[in-house]
Amino acid sequence: DKLDGQEVLFPVALPGSLWEESGRYESVGSELLRFTDRTGSKMVLGMTHEEASVQLVREYANSYAKYPFMIYQIQTKFRDEARPRAGLIRVREFTMKDAYSFHTSQEDLEQYYQRCYDAYNRIFARCGIPEVAVVKSDSGMMGGSISHEYMLLTAAGEDSIAICPECGYSANVEAAPSIVKNENTIAKEELKEVATPGTGTIEELCEFLHIPAENTAKAVVYQRNADDSYVVAFIRGDLDINETKLTNALGC
């Protein structure tokens, strides 16, 4: 409220037409719970409420004089998590405070973002929770140029973060830039076809050919949600593809 926010309460069940308009009805995966009402109209259980907030604003905030402003709610959210586990760590139904601000310029948005950032820092400090790391993160399906996560450091967690004790930089590994050392000293040879029967993994291939994993490459095939097209990504055999960075690079 000190940020001049106005509290609202959006419906849990939302018209699928709003999500179709934004494109997220198709682009969001199975985490979005979809169903139809008795008339056959598409409905969803809200995992976030961007579409609902935009619908509200475009109906009632039809004058520049009403901007900027922020609306927020504390509401039940639903996500059909593939691996719900560990109590509050990953659940299908949870309570979340979400806020949506509207501005007439990018500069005003960035200034307000900093106010929200400072407010969350004060909240955690007031609650006396010391083991909270503020890290840069990927904006995911929400998009945007910058995003932060407040992560509680615990052995029970499932995310990994990178923190530099020298400069204070911190980021989720999904968003942190990295440099791969090119230490491949393999001698160049003529291209030739080699039979590798019964080698379904990089480990089996390396054992069969008696070579290290960094001297191999693997291809991983993905299917886009939006248009069902395929993407083939190649990476060195001893590394794993960062799917978040791949998604951002492809713009999908």
Please place each PLM-identified region on the residue numbering.
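Extended, low-hydrophobicity, polar/charged segments
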Residues: 50-55, 59, 85-99, 107-252
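Short C-terminal domain-edge/linker segments immediately following a structured domain
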Residues: 39-43, 75-78, 102-107, 120, ...
